[in-house]
């Protein structure tokens, strides 16, 4: 069993160096090589106010990582860390998965005015339980803050895929989709707001209703997705809401 912090340095094709700290959700942090001669390496990460210094010994670089007055040993070697995720569903699957896409037209249906975030196509996966029949319930999954794929993959864990598998085996269909600018979804991720994310989810609900295949339609939202679930319920767009770690206080009390 591995305990600790995974840190990876990458030398890019243009000679620049970046650092990833996947356990902290940080990737592509620019690093400056301050010293590279014979067996000595020194790298500075100004954004983190951190520095790494090490010496080559055999197949490893033995060194020290320092940040804001704290230091600890950090040894580097070539390789790939494979994390065991036994909960990730594996084929064969006892249900059907269909690639779908739906559109947020970026226009208010009542006023005709542009909406926040603008137009986007959202690519996703619609999962049907075995022996699916019209009128079965369906759940649309809404991710938390930040742009994530349809599985809401975080550090190699795919919670939305796990939940979709669980629900499909219990007779509930699901729709999960890539956030704007991720995977097969279009749109400008720099213009994303909670409102635009809500409208994307609403477009997903409208798509599900347009198929005329499902009965009750619910929203399962994680973190910020829980807020979006409440927003959609308040508008009368969903039949039920499941909030995973969604706030229950006013925003000005949460922050």
Q: Where are the language model's segments positioned?
A:
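Short beta-strand element of the alpha/beta-hydrolase
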Residues: 135-144
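Central antiparallel beta-sheet cores of small beta-barrel/beta-sandwich binding domains
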Residues: 1-66, 87
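The serine-hydrolase catalytic nucleophile loop
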Residues: 149-162, 179
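Conserved alpha/beta-hydrolase
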Residues: 162-184
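N-terminal cap/lid segment of alpha/beta-hydrolase-fold proteins
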Residues: 82-134
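Alpha/beta-hydrolase active-site loop
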Residues: 190-211
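Active-site nucleophile loop of the alpha/beta-hydrolase fold
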Residues: 242-252
